[in-house]
Amino acid sequence: VPHLRFPEFSGEWKKCKLGDLCNVLMCKRILVSQTNTEDGVPFYKIGTIGSTPDAYISKELFDDYKVKYNYPRKGEVMITCAGTVGKCVVYDGEDAYFQDSNIVWIDNPTQYISNGFLFHLLSKVDWRKLNSTTIIRIYNDDLRNLKMSYPRKEEQQKISHLLSLLDERIATQNKIIEDL
């Protein structure tokens, strides 16, 4: 149970591993020869997820892969597993494709944990503690074995809402500072 808590909630938080509740999935590999830099469906890589894409795939390839292979549902949490590890983005449901094992998503049925709460939980993990090597990578088993605690859904919603408001406020303040 956290030290700071909304007064209307009580009781213990449940403890588990992320893999007890969710699965870790990724898109089918896209070859460089299947991309272009001008038009089509955005193809996000670890350096572009959450911002502007610099590569695209054909609509036909996208439609084919979306039907045949794993593809995220709107609201699911995506996470970068190489390069800048641990960057989390909530999938907005727009047509896009993602770089295979470098970007994975948490296939979360939301029965026990909301995607909003999961986003904030995963965003706060210090992924540098995973490896003793210089090059850090998050493996699927690292995510599945991640120990976590979570409250009832009502409390998750309230926590997620508050943290989202704080994130928005911080982003606004950072923008103001940048514009000075």
Regions found by a protein language model. Name each.
Residues V1-K14, D142-K147, P151-L180:
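Amphipathic alpha-helical segments with low aromatic content
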Residues H3-K28, S51:
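Non-catalytic DNA-recognition/assembly elements of restriction-modification systems
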Residues L4, C16-G19, G47, S101, ...:
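Structural detector for helix-capping/boundary residues
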Residues G19-C22, V32-D63, R73:
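DNA target-recognition patches
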Residues V32, C81, Y97-V104, S132-E154:
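A short glycine-rich beta-alpha junction/loop motif
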Residues K45-I46, Y56, F62-S123, Y139:
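A short beta-sheet element
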